[in-house]
Amino acid sequence: MNPFSLSCVALKFSAARLTGQNKELSILKRLSSRNAEPEDSQGAHTIRLLDYFEVRGPNGVHEVIVTEVVLGWNEMRYSAVALPPVRKVTAELALGLAHIHNCDIVHGDLHVGNIGFRMNGFDQVDEFQVLQAIDAVTDQFCYPVISENLEMNVAGLPTYIVSSDNKIGWMAALCDVDRLTALIMDFGEAFVEPEAPSKPNIMFYLQPPELLLNLQPLSKAGDIWAFGCTVSELVLRWPLFANILNEKELLKRMVATLGPLPREWQLDNALAWLNLDDDDVQLITAGQKDQGYMLDRVALSWFRSVTEIPPSAQVIEDTQALFSMLSALLQFEPKSRPPIDEVLKHPWLRQFTTRDTAV
């Protein structure tokens, strides 16, 4: 089933199961079936399913998903390899999300940790070159697995584990790190609409307000909210709603960042569930923004990263466009957030969703 004939692939082992099939596998199959060509402008920005199989172990049957090898955002950001421009990454993620939504799929867990980068030319590298590069830059160690509890049944444990390798080091030695393509990966929490899970497993600080207040299940609009938070984090290099300890604080931070909640929302049950006192309720209903948290800081951060002195009229216009896009993505009311196909046409992204431009 591997049409790309890669010499190096990534394996993802699911937890052991008794019956049924891995949900992530069915989602990846659905995405693949809607892709006529691997270089499709939208489908090229989601992880590629290459193959799948099952293995039986002491804990049951494990489904194994075979995909291309990519670099993760988190390993890239702490390396010496320069990250691609945020605007280009955002446009490519928007293309990937459009492909996902056009397949009637909700990703359900979009954040920077689920951003991958495909390295140009890696599919042309043969196995011998890979082994040479790994041997040259990687020091790996094997560690025995020993239970601290002598009475524990260790039949289901491996006899040893291997330390993770310096993947970015040996991949960078083989490929052009200046040409990276951003994509969306990890579909373990994805689902086909309208089959939303009753208790979605989503990053705490990325919960859309309708989910936080238990007003509406997760949906494509929730992905749009997460996309807005993710773009903000790409710019700031820090989560938009950072240093939050609980749901009450998250709601207060949302209001401080975005203003008042919609008046038509029935919040009596939600406010009681969040254990808000009178001062909290007054603050939230007043909807007073806090200058230290407003969206302006995201646009200003991007402006500082790209501007020349004095700033050109184009840079100022682009900064205003970024602010308007984030303001649209991060609307409290789900139905007020634009669908991803409209986001692709936004002035801040439009030129990058039709051609590969690194600005």
Where do the language-model regions lie?
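Intrinsically disordered, low-complexity regulatory segments of kinases
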Residues: 1-359
